[in-house]
């Protein structure tokens, strides 16, 4: 028995459809070929894993579940305490769900959501700052070509030179401020 064969019963039209969709070739020994998953799908899944907003969306289900368990365990604990206070029933025999454990799980989900939202907000602020101070898009390839005025994306070496100029300007301003502060302190 071949483990690669599906043992599902098929009707005539389904069998014909499978036969037509299978690659044409002589029936014989099955050749095992390694199939590689398409690269764009993998990159999309990796980008989705890295996206903070999608992480927040995936945490909403566990957050709802932990909130439900927390409220349910607190209601059960209140009911058991009320019965014990009224001396109606002995509460030692029943299994009481751990309210503190469920509350801790709820807060852990809230903390994870908060971290992902803060990270997404910081990424958005960084992107806005980047768009403000360097409005042209950057091509990811290293290529040395001439750049006509307003031709679109700037090359990576041009981007590196722009960053170097910005860093040097910031250092010059920093050094000027330090020397001015030292001159003021020496004058006093």
Swiss-Prot record:
GO terms for molecular function: DNA-binding transcription factor binding; transcription coregulator activity. Keywords: Activator, Differentiation, Nucleus, Sexual differentiation, Transcription, Transcription regulation. InterPro entries: Mediator_Med29_met (IPR021018). The keyword Transcription applies. One of its GO terms (biological process) is sex determination. Its main location: nucleus. Residues 1-43 are annotated as: Disordered. One of its GO terms (cellular component) is mediator complex. It is found in: Nucleus. Residues 1-23, 30-43 have a biased composition (Low complexity). Pfam families: Med29. The keyword Amino-acid biosynthesis does not apply. Component of the Mediator complex, a coactivator involved in the regulated transcription of nearly all RNA polymerase II-dependent genes. Mediator functions as a bridge to convey information from gene-specific regulatory proteins to the basal RNA polymerase II transcription machinery. Mediator is recruited to promoters by direct interactions with regulatory proteins and serves as a scaffold for the assembly of a functional preinitiation complex with RNA polymerase II and the general transcription factors. Required for female somatic sexual development. Belongs to the Mediator complex subunit 29 family. Component of the Mediator complex. Self-associates. Interacts with dsx. This is Mediator of RNA polymerase II transcription subunit 29. It comes from Drosophila melanogaster (Fruit fly).
